């Protein structure tokens, strides 16, 4: 997180995180990740290190899982000689939501072995309060599995709110 203040772009940040992770992890251990940069141009730039594609919920309720243009290895495996991920742009407009999550969410199974249908649960994200929306999604995941998921199940919800134009100053 600290490196984000020092690196001029997302690729540089990703390279720095890769070096740090490679130093910290031993052997064949690795970490998947998605790095995201949200600007004022109604786009999010994503850098995907072998992680599940984020879920983008459009204003009309439609869902997209924007995949990277090419597969990239997870963080910590740069010694295998492959290039890092290519950044890719995804439209992200006011009123839309971007859900970043770990594979523990989508790989959570019910008693019959069915995976959690994340793309079918967007109605739970209509809750105006983002914290409550995530809590409803988490509760639904626990209900699906019949208890806490067996793997980590982290989620981060980003909502794009309209920017308020500054009003006239006192005068």
Please tell me what each predicted stretch does.
Residues 1-171:
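Conserved subregion of the PPM/PP2C metallophosphatase catalytic domain
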């Amino acid at each position: 997180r600290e490196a984000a203040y020092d690196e001029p772009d997302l690729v540089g940040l990703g390279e720095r995180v890769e070096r740090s992770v490679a130093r910290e992890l031993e052997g064949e251990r690795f970490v998947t990740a998605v790095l995201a940069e949200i600007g004022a141009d109604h786009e999010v730039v994503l850098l995907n290190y072998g992680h599940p594609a984020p879920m983008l919920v459009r204003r009309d309720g439609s869902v997209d899982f924007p995949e990277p243009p090419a597969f990239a290895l997870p963080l910590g495996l740069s010694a295998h000689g492959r290039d890092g991920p290519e950044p890719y742009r995804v439209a992200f407009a006011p009123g839309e939501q971007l859900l970043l999550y770990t594979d523990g969410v989508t790989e959570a199974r019910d008693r019959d072995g069915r995976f959690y249908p994340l793309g079918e649960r967007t109605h739970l994200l209509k809750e105006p309060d983002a914290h409550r929306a995530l809590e409803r999604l988490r509760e639904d995941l626990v209900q699906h599995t019949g208890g806490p998921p067996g793997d980590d199940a982290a989620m981060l919800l980003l909502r794009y709110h309209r920017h308020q134009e500054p009003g006239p100053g006192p005068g």
